[in-house]
């Protein structure tokens, strides 16, 4: 982002360093089917997902503002129209996942639906999380939801699970998809990493952050999806699985064991940091 290149705002750049990504954030990535009616339409490093229904599309995550042209191109390459997107969702309120929301909303007229705990951040374009990184364009929020609320379009229903920690309103979405006559439970997992410089003990921005993460891992252990994806491709092995998908054979995104390992590894990292901060 240009904002991080300006010497005059070095302090802001330092604050957002852990939220910045590598060059892959702004590199194209071929769109592909994840499972059933669910497609990957993001960049190499920032995930965006398109869920196709008879009544139009649902997009989860808009990446940075610079991601929007890539998302649009990928949607069209799949044979769909961006103007058919009716609902815009998000995993959480950080600039690399909602930075393109305002532009996508203008381009599509889509209804923006957000978790209540991230509503103010998304609407004002201000990072209210423990990270406190760069902001984004203000977004008109059309509907505010709470934990376990559902969003339905064209017979497809997604359930919103509040999984706080990374942000206060971090949302893991679940739905079902059918492929080759089989039904798969799918989870779009919100980020569970702890950004560099964020403390779990004595955090003045988000005092309950340690308890938030603990709640999240309890919930994630119980989800048990067949297919899991996340807000950065590296988290769920996007590139390797995409190569296997192109080669044919069994759908590589059907990976319940990979999900279990992901949750265990992420929780271990959280507990390691928590114990270190507690001096244990």
Task: Identify the residue ranges that each predicted region occupies.
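Active-site HxH/HxHxD metal-binding segment of metal-dependent hydrolases
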Residues: 66-69, 76-150, 254, 262
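Divalent metal-coordination and catalytic microenvironments
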Residues: 37, 51, 61, 71, ...
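Conserved beta-strand hairpin/beta-sheet module of binuclear metal-dependent hydrolase folds
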Residues: 24-78, 82, 173-194, 199
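Metallo-beta-lactamase
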Residues: 20, 27-29, 33-35, 84, ...
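Bacterial N-terminal signal peptides
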Residues: 5-15
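Active-site neighborhood of phospho(di)ester-bond hydrolases with catalytic His/Asp-centered motifs
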Residues: 60-62, 85-93, 112-115, 162-165, ...
